[in-house]
Amino acid sequence: PGEKLVSDVTYLPLKDGSWCYVSLVKDLCTGEIVACATSKSQNMDLAMRTLEQLRAPLTQGVFHTDQGYLYTNPVFSHKLKKLGFTQSLSRKGNCLDNAVIESFNGTMKCEWFYPRYNKARWDLSFDDASTFVMEYVKYYNEERIQKKLGYLTPIEYRRQITQN
C-alpha cells in the first residue's frame, strides 16, 4: 500500500454556473482514496493541498497522473520527489493511461452525484459539493465492497494485507 498512486482532477457543476474542482489520489494496491481536496479553482493550491495529505511510501513510490498543467509544474514535481515518489505521466492526450482514477471519477458521479441531482437543475453550492465529495470518499473507502478486493472494502483490504 502507498507505493503506486494515481491522481486526477474532476469537477462538479454548481448552481451559480461555476465548478467545484475535486483532486483525488487513489492507491492502486488497496483501491483506497488516500487524498482528496476541493477548490473553487483548478490551481496549484488544490494540487499541493492534495499532496500534503499523503504519507511517504515505505520504499520508492510511483505517482501517476495525466499531463495536466498542475502535474507538469516544477513545484508539484519537486514536492513529489521530496515525498519519495517518482513521477509518471500519461502519454499526451491518452486518457486510457490514467483509466483507474478516471473510472473512479465516473463511478462517483454515476453512483452518488447524478442520482441525487437533476442534470437540468444543478442546485449545489460549493460547500454542498465539497461535503458530497467527502461523504462519497468515506462511503467508497469504508462501505463499498469490491469484487477485485475479495468483496472487502478498500480499508478492510488494506488492514487484511498489512496484518499478514
Q: Where are each of the predicted segments found?
A:
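Charged DNA-binding/catalytic regions of mobile-element recombinases
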Residues: 1-164
